Amino acid sequence: SAHLQRKNEIIAQRDNARTQWIAGVSHDVRTPLALILGWAEQLEQDKALPAPARQKAGGIRTQSEKLRALIDDLNLTSKLQYGAQPLRKELCAAGPLVRELVAQFCDSPLAERCDLSLTQTPAAEQAKLSVDRPLLGRLLENLLNNSIRHNEAPVRLGIRTEVVGGSFCLTVADDGAGYPPAVLAALNAPEPVENAPHILGLHVVDNIASAHGGRAVFGKNTPHGAKTTLWLPLDT
């Protein structure tokens, strides 16, 4: 009916306005944040400064990098939720793709705080996936970062890929404290949970999986730790 169509148009306009507003705020914040990061790096590396001052500058840089990641996650999850993020899918061999993404992470400073292993079954090595490579990289980065940031170093991280029941399965597990019960309840709830903990990075993981026609399952590792399993459709 005309009334229902008009209602849907209003909802679409509201969602678009929200996405545009978040994108605008994210853009405006990035410029001063880039300056803060740049100055902090300069001060951190300035040999003329006393060690305590350089250490504080390093702290400012680290916290600024966290803030930048949060802004990126907020912008991305908003676009994914409201269909404003175009997927640039390409056909990839899963084995080389996962190795490439893991190698990229190993080049980051956070990788020094973990013991990372990768295991891929022969079927997973040969599997074909139709994915947006940067988004899948973001998904894996968020999972690994979450394990490292919420556990004492060095945390042991294992990535395993396999083909199960006609789907590609990627599991990321750690030996840390595990997801708090409130976080698991919020992540696995079918509807948004009231007063849910702030888990933006993990929501991005969930949204990226859904955008690819897959799903992310968050749970507990054995005997302890966090475990997330990503299920993606195979491209045949």
Task: Label every PLM stretch briefly.
Residues Y82-L87, K128-V131:
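Conserved micro-motifs of the catalytic ATP-binding
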Residues G83, S108-Q120:
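Short conserved segments within the C-terminal catalytic ATPase subdomain
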Residues N146-I148:
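Short helix-loop "hinge" at the ATP-lid/N-box region of the Bergerat-fold HATPase_c
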